[in-house]
Amino acid sequence: MGCTLSAEDKAAVERSKMIDRNLREDGEKAAREVKLLLLGAGESGKSTIVKQMKIIHEAGYSEEECKQYKAVVYSNTIQSIIAIIRAMGRLKIDFGDSARADDARQLFVLAGAAEEGFMTAELAGVIKRLWKDSGVQACFNRSREYQLNDSAAYYLNDLDRIAQPNYIPTQQDVLRTRVKTTGIVETHFTFKDLHFKMFDVGGQRSERKKWIHCFEGVTAIIFCVALSDYDLVLAEDEEMNRMHESMKLFDSTCNNKWFTDTSIILFLNKKDLFEEKIKKSPLTICYPEYAGSNTYEEAAAYIQCQFEDLNKRKDTKEIYTHFTCATDTKNVQFVFDAVTDVIIKNNLKDCGLF
C-alpha cells in the first residue's frame, strides 16, 4: 500500500499549516504592538514626554492647537509670579524698590484677565517691573523653599514676546506648559514599524490607586524622575523630600508582581536644571551620607545607583537608565530611538522570534 494521504489527511495537514501560519502572524503582530506606561511622581516630566511624541512621531502641534495653549501659557506665567510674590512675605524678603508693592497689589487685581487668555499691556508692564526687582530675584533664587513651576523663568524672561497681541505659542512654549494630569491620557503613534500606545497616568498621590491592576502585561514602563527634585519637598506633603518619594514609588513599581516580565526604563529627567542646581545646592540635602563632589557627573551617577540598587531582581531584570531633558526635542528623539531598539529586542525574544 502506498503512502499517499487521503483527502481528509491532506485537509488536516493544510489546517495545521494554516494554524501555524496564523500563530506566527499573531506572534509577529504582537511583537509590533507596544504598550508603554509612563510612571513617576508629580511634575517629573511625563506629560512633556507625551507632547514630544506628538512633535517627533506625528506632525507636532498645528497653529490652531498652539493657539489653544495661549491661556495655559498666561496662566502658568501669572501663577509663577504670584507664587514668588507670596513667598516673599513668608521668607521675609523686601522689594528692592518699595514702589513695587503697588505693582504687586495691581497684579492681584489684573490677574483674572490672563487666566482667561488675555494679557493686557498694563498687566505685562506690572509683571515685567516685578520680575526685574532685586527682591523678587532674590526670592526666585530661593525657590527650593516653596512650590514654583520649572517654566517660571522661561516665560517671565520672554514676556515681551508672549505679551504681544498676536502671540501664538511655539512648540517649545507648549512643551513648557504645566497642567496637572488627572486620569489616564492615551497616545498612539507608529515608529520603526511598531505601533505604540503610550499611557500617561496622573502623578499626584491621590491618582495612584487608579494604576496598577489595569496595566499588567504592558511591554515597558518608562519611569520618570526629576533629578532637580533632590532638594525639594512634595506639593502634596511638605515634609516629604521629592527624591525620596520618587525612590519609594520606583521601588514599588520595579519590584511589583504585575511587572515581573516588563522592561523598566528609567528616565533621570531635568538634567539641565540639575546641572545648574548642583553648583549651589549640595546633594547631601537629600543623601546625607553622600561624600562625593558636587559635580554633575559624580552626583548624577550617585542618584542613578540609588535607584538601580532598589531593583530586587538584578539577576533577571535589567534597568535601562537614560539621562534626559524632556523639553529638548533632539535629546528625547535620541533617547527614544535607543529605548525602541531595546523594546524590539526584548519583544522579539518574548515572541520566540529572536
Curated annotation (Swiss-Prot):
One of its GO terms (molecular function) is G protein-coupled receptor binding. Residues 324-329 are annotated as: G5 motif. A lipid is attached at G2 (N-myristoyl glycine). Residues 196-205 are annotated as: G3 motif. Its main location: nucleus. Residues 35-48 are annotated as: G1 motif. Residues 32-354 form the G-alpha domain. It is a peripheral membrane protein; Lipid-anchor. Myristoylation at Gly-2 is required for membrane anchoring before palmitoylation. Palmitoylation at Cys-3 varies with membrane lipid composition. Mg(2+) binds at S47, T181. Transmembrane segments: none annotated. Keywords: Cell cycle, Cell division, Cell membrane, Cytoplasm, Cytoskeleton, GTP-binding, Hydrolase, Lipoprotein, Magnesium, Membrane, Metal-binding, Mitosis, Myristate, Nucleotide-binding, Nucleus, Palmitate, Transducer, Transport. GO terms for cellular component: cell cortex; centrosome; cytoplasm; heterotrimeric G-protein complex; midbody; nucleus; plasma membrane. Residues 173-181 are annotated as: G2 motif. The keyword Cell division applies. GTP binds at residues 43-48, 150-151, 175-178, 200-204, 269-272, 326. Residues 265-272 are annotated as: G4 motif. GO terms for biological process: adenylate cyclase-modulating G protein-coupled receptor signaling pathway; cell division; cellular response to forskolin; G protein-coupled receptor signaling pathway; positive regulation of protein localization to cell cortex; regulation of mitotic spindle organization. InterPro entries: Gprotein_alpha_I, Gprotein_alpha_su, GproteinA_insert, P-loop_NTPase. Belongs to the G-alpha family. G(i/o/t/z) subfamily. Heterotrimeric G proteins are composed of 3 units; alpha, beta and gamma. The alpha chain contains the guanine nucleotide binding site. Part of a spindle orientation complex at least composed of GNAI1, GPSM2 and NUMA1. Identified in complex with the beta subunit GNB1 and the gamma subunit GNG1. Identified in complex with the beta subunit GNB1 and the gamma subunit GNG2. Component of the TAS2R14-GNAI1 complex, consisting of TAS2R14, GNAI1, GNB1 and GNG2; within the complex interacts with TAS2R14; this complex plays a role in the perception of bitterness. This is Guanine nucleotide-binding protein G(i) subunit alpha-1. It comes from Pongo abelii.
